[in-house]
């Protein structure tokens, strides 16, 4: 991808973010934009960084590690947003600053145990808000117990929720439901040292406007910025 094309895509995306924020009286500077770069090259990520995208989301561990090696000179915030295999938690804990796809106490515990000394890992709980059997994520009825038990784990900060809606779910309905759950769960953070509950990660290229208007403060965009995967 040419740098000029990426910069143009980013400019248009920022305009859409600004408009969505204006509609709900939200400050656009409160929105974290994560560039999702699965199948994109390290050179494309470097272009994105130079254009101002400093948070990068990756779905596949080995692909991400290769890119990280090529981009050590950049101060990138790396987010793991894919499905987590138990045998990969050590490498995820060692190499990423954020993990968006925690859906069990077992995974949270492994990430906590395997996080390097002196490092704090930011975790988001993936919520299956529409109860889609084909999607990963914890059911809303189980999330309070998971968060409460995870408060005893060292080396992590529980920052909030990550949402991926099912294809058939109306984003207006799905995201508003998720936002209500997020706000309700904020009460859990009182008196808990490692619960911060300040991050609602929801919204992708096709529906990030609705997500922002429903309360998201972190969006994960790939196609809008980089075009079809691998280009």
Task: Specify the residue positions occupied by each region the protein language model found.
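Short C-terminal tail/terminal secondary-structure segment
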Residues: 221, 226-231
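Divalent-metal-activated hydrolytic enzyme cores
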Residues: 217-218
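Conserved alpha/beta-domain cores
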Residues: 1-206, 212-214, 226-228
């Amino acid at each position: 991808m040419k740098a000029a094309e990426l910069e143009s895509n980013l400019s248009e995306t920022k305009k859409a973010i600004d408009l969505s924020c204006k509609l709900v009286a939200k400050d656009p500077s409160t929105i974290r934009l994560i560039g999702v770069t699965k199948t994109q090259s390290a050179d494309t990520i470097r272009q994105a960084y130079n254009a101002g995208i400093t948070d990068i989301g990756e779905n596949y561990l080995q692909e991400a590690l290769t890119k990280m090696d090529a981009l050590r000179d950049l101060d990138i915030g790396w987010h793991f947003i894919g499905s987590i295999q138990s045998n990969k938690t050590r490498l995820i804990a060692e190499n990423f600053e954020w993990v968006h796809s925690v859906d069990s106490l077992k995974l949270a515990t492994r990430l906590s145990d395997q996080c390097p000394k002196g490092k704090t890992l930011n975790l988001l709980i993936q919520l299956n808000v529409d109860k889609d059997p084909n999607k990963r994520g914890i059911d809303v009825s189980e999330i309070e117990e998971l968060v409460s038990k995870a408060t005893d784990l060292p080396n992590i900060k529980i920052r909030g929720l990550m949402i991926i809606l099912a294809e058939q779910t109306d984003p207006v309905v799905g995201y508003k439901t998720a936002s209500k759950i997020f706000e309700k769960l904020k009460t859990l953070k009182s008196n808990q040292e490692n619960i911060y509950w300040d991050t609602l990660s929801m919204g992708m290229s096709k529906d990030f406007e609705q997500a922002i208007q429903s309360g998201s403060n972190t969006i994960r965009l790939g196609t809008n910025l980089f075009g079809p995967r691998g280009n």
